Structures are given as C-alpha cells and as structure tokens.
A protein has these predicted regions:
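Alpha-helical transmembrane segments of multipass membrane proteins
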Residues: 91, 210-214, 237-242, 270, ...
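N-terminal chloroplast transit peptides
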Residues: 1-45
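Short alpha-helical transmembrane segments in multi-pass integral membrane proteins
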Residues: 28, 39-76, 134-204, 238, ...
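Short runs within selected transmembrane alpha-helices of multi-pass transporters and secretion channels
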Residues: 124-128, 197-217, 228-233, 254-270, ...
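Helix-terminus/linker motif at the lipid-water interface of multi-pass membrane proteins
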Residues: 80, 84-107, 176-185, 242-249, ...
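Small-residue-rich hydrophobic transmembrane alpha-helices
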Residues: 106-166, 208-220, 224-225, 341-407, ...
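Core transmembrane alpha-helical segments of multi-pass membrane transporters/permeases
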Residues: 71-84, 93, 129, 300-332, ...
Length: 524
C-alpha cells in the first residue's frame, strides 16, 4: 500500500492518529525536490530475524536435493533391472541347446556368441549420442530436433543393419575362423546356423536400441524400457523351446526365436514413442524406408548428419579399444593354463553381473546433465552429477563388499574343481578394485556423454587401452598370473577414471567446472 493510499479518506480502516498532512504524493512535489532523488523509493524489506530465513533456505535445498535424488533413482533402477536381465537371457539359449542338442551344439555357441557380441557391442554404441541429442532437444523445447535425430539414427541403423545381415551371412565362415573354428571343425555348421539368423536381426536390434535411447533420454522413461526388455524376455522364453524342441530347429531355431523377439519388441517400442504427446516424434515408416533404401529425402534428414556420424564413430572407437583390451587379456590368460582361464571366465561373468548395478547411474547422469546444460543450468548439472556419483560409489562399495564376503559361495556355485576355485579367489581383490573404479568412472563418462564430448572419451579410452595392453605384453614375458593381468586391466580403468573426472569437473573447457558454473550463474 502506498503512502498516498494510506490516507483515512481512502482507507477507513487506518488509524486516524497518523499525521496525514505528511502524506504528500511525490508527483505533487517540485521537480527539484530531493524526494525525486529516490528518498521515497521503497527499499528492500529485511526480515526481523535471519534465523527462519536461513532455516527455510536450508530446508529448500534439502527438498531440492531429495527431489533430484528421486529423479536419479527413478531413472537408474529400471535401467539396472533391464541390464541385469540380459545375462539371464544369454543363458536361455545355452540351456535349451545343451539339453536338447548335445555337447557339440553347445560348444558351437561359444564362438558364435563371441562374434555376435563383438559386432553388436560396437553397433549398439549409437544409443549414446541419440540419448544425449534427444534429451537436449526436449529440454530446449525443440521437438522437431528429436524428429530429425531419430530420422537420421533410424536411417543409419537400417542401412548398417542390412549390410551386417548380408555381409555376415556371406562371411560367416570367415568370422568364425577368427574364433578358431576351422572349415573341417564339427563346430562350423551349428555355429554358422546360429550366427546367420542372429545377424539378420541386426536391423531390428538397432531400431530397438535407438527407440529405447529415445524413451530414456527424451522422455526420461526407463520404466518403459524395462517393460520392453521384459516383453522380449517373455517372448524369447516361449519361442526358444518351441523352435528348438517343438520344431526341431536346432541352433538356428534358437537364433530365430531371439531374432523374432527382437523385432516384436522393436515394433512395440515404435508404438510407444509414436503415441507420446507433443509429437510427431517419428517419421512415417514408408517415408523412412524410402529414405533409407531408395534414396528419397525426408524433411530434415539431410541436416546434422555429421554430428551424429562423428559421435557414433567416436563411440565405436571407444568400444573397439575396450573390447580389444579384454580380448588381449583373455588370450594371455589362455596361455597361462586351463584353471586360470576357467577362473577368469567365471570372474568375468560375476564381475559383469555386479557391474550392471551401476549402469543406471551413468544413464541418469547423462540424461540429466545434458538437459540441465541445454537449459543453461550448469551449476545444477554439476551437483546432479556429484550426487549421482555418490550413489554409484555407495553401490560400488556394497557390490565389492558382497563379492569379498561371498567369494567362496560364488566360486562353489559356479565350479567344483578346487584349482579353479583357488584361482577364482585370487581374482577377487583386483575385481573389487575395478568395481570401485567403475563407480566413479561410469558416472564421469556419463557426464561427458551428456556434454557431447564423445571424441575426447574415445581418445582417452584408446590411450588407456594402449597403456594396459603394453603392460600386459610386458608381463607376458615374465610368466604372469591371472591376478597380474587383472591388475593390468585396472591400469586401463584408472586412467579412464582419473582423466574422465578431470575433464568432467575440473577442466576449463567443461561447463561443469566450479569456476565455469559460477561464472555462468553470475552472467545470468
């Protein structure tokens, strides 16, 4: 209420004892009056006590932190469950093939799965840039950019998937030969029968990967991704025994069951994304097919190809470097002996099962950081990433402790040979250290992906892989043990973690560094 409006003639509820002759409007004073200099301008209203204000601000900060923690966990836990289902699915084909087709067919799955995992792990890297690009577009309220990104990504995946299917079918014997399956080996035919149908599922798998990345990135709906994974697992569980036992399809039947499940999940994912409000998010299937295979251009499809291809090339290089390091480690341990190799295989499976519990925090940090940076909130992105890292480190510590406490039970459940059990227990300390390193490294890499720094992540991983391979090759000359090789792998992880943390939080080029975040807040 202004001083003029406080007059009793205008406001009867006011006290009549006030000296209203002083209630003079500023506009009625002469121009040169000092009151025009701002003496009657309202100043800031200060609270009588700063205690409640401080408490209220602390309470608000705690509320914001709890809200962001819930957001991180809501993204992380469905992703963790979805990633944990994959190892179980990989055992499904193994179970039915071993039960119904015999040891030769079971042994043939080994090299076929090696080739399949190698190729698909590299191809699936397209999901990382798609997740960041769609998250940034939605945060910036540019749905047309989401449509453009998905058009480009789906065209790329369909083209690459078709090439992989055709070339893989022709070159399957050569690919299996790289896994030590010779032309005269009895493993060749069942391995080829399994590999070729799986490669024909490449277009469907890549489509599913891109749409899942869109659901988790643009819409932050990892629960929908989990439902898709469960759908694929259910279909695979039903179709695999039907194809192997009912139709006597052999290893090819098991592969076709997985491929059909993948295509069905891709169709459901397409429907989920297309029905999201605020679209259109997806191009029409006919136009997309014409663009991918007939060369007809869709509006917006020709723009921004360089960014997507560069990001995918960088992620491919990163995955190739990491997989090559593990391949070299496996080859060196193979020369050490059978028991260390069996222990290495069991520890790798166990380690990956524990590692998937931290994958969700990498995804959450990537999605939330990319959205906050797109909104111009680098300081919020910084403490979001730090809180995600704290959660990941807690999970990493818990999994490392669980591995140490349950090492004997895990070894006894996997193998019965006392030599293998003894070798397995010697690998527990380096595996625990690797879990702790991953707790920080994966979140740091998720931040870098959210910032779009794919090229630097690829360079860092390539450098670290070269260093780790060099250490392992030097150790191979002095009769190393399997724990020596695993500690050498920790060289790779440590380099990636240290340089990744510096790049994400301390580099001058990072918007999440403390100085850059403060400068951005002051500018705003």
């Amino acid at each position: 209420m202004s001083l003029w409006n406080a007059c009793p003639s205008r406001n009867p509820s006011c006290s009549s004892s006030f000296p209203w002759f002083l209630a003079v409007r500023v506009m009625d004073l002469p121009f040169r009056s000092p009151l025009h200099g701002g003496l009657l301008r309202p100043g800031p209203v200060l609270p009588r006590s700063r205690g409640p204000v401080v408490l209220r601000s602390k309470r608000d900060v705690e509320v914001r932190h709890r809200k962001r923690d819930r957001e991180i966990l809501s993204l992380a836990w469905p992703a963790v469950l979805g990633a944990s289902i994959d190892p179980v699915l990989s055992l499904l084909d193994t179970y039915w093939v071993s039960r119904c087709l015999g040891m030769v067919a079971l042994a043939a799955l080994g090299p076929a799965l090696n080739v399949e995992d190698w190729m698909f792990d590299i191809l699936k890297t397209v999901q990382v840039p798609v997740r960041s690009l769609t998250s940034e577009a939605v945060a910036a309220k540019k749905p047309q950019d989401v449509l453009q990104t998905l058009t480009q990504a789906l065209c790329f995946c369909w083209r690459v998937g078709l090439v992989v299917a055709l070339m893989g079918s022709v070159l399957a014997p050569l690919l299996l030969r790289l896994s030590s399956v010779e032309a005269s080996s009895p493993l060749l035919e069942p391995a080829k029968a399994y590999l070729v149908p799986r490669l024909w599922g490449s277009p469907g798998l890549l489509t599913l990967i891109v749409l899942q990345a869109t659901l988790s990135g643009a819409f932050r709906d990892t629960t929908a991704v989990l439902r898709l994974v469960l759908l694929g697992a259910f279909l695979n569980a039903v179709l695999t025994p039907l194809a192997v036992v009912g139709m006597h399809g052999g290893t090819a039947g098991a592969a076709w069951a997985t491929t059909v499940s993948c295509y069905a999940s891709a169709v459901c994912a397409w429907i989920m994304v297309a029905r999201r409000p605020g679209g259109p998010w997806l191009p029409q299937p006919r136009k997309l097919f014409a663009t991918a295979f007939l060369g007809k251009e869709v509006e917006g499809e020709s723009k921004g190809w360089g960014k997507l291809l560069a990001a995918n090339a960088a992620m491919t290089l990163r995955s190739f470097s990491s997989l090559t390091t593990w391949l070299v480690a496996c080859s060196i341990i193979t020369k050490i002996g059978v028991a260390p190799l069996a222990a290495h295989t069991c520890m790798t499976k166990t380690f990956l099962s524990f590692l998937y519990w931290m994958y969700g925090f990498q995804l959450a940090s990537q999605v939330l950081v990319s959205a906050d940076v797109a909104k111009g909130l680098p300081r919020r992105a910084r403490w979001t990433a730090l809180r995600a890292m704290r959660m990941a480190m807690l999970v990493a510590s818990a999994t490392a402790l669980a591995l140490w406490v349950g090492r004997e039970s895990i070894a006894a459940a996997l193998v019965r040979d006392p030599l293998v059990i003894q070798s397995f227990e010697t690998l527990v300390p380096p595996a625990m250290a690797m879990l702790l390193i991953y707790g920080a490294m994966w979140v740091a890499e998720g931040v870098l992906y959210g910032l779009g720094d794919y090229a630097w992540a690829a360079k860092c991983t390539s450098f670290a892989a070269s260093a780790a391979i060099l250490v392992m090759l030097l150790l191979s000359r002095v009769q190393p043990t399997a724990p020596h090789i695993w500690w050498s792998l920790n060289v790779l992880m440590s380099i990636r973690a240290i340089f990744g943390l510096h790049r994400a939080f301390f580099s001058k080029r990072s918007p999440l560094s403390s100085k850059a975040a403060m400068a951005s807040e002051i500018t705003q």
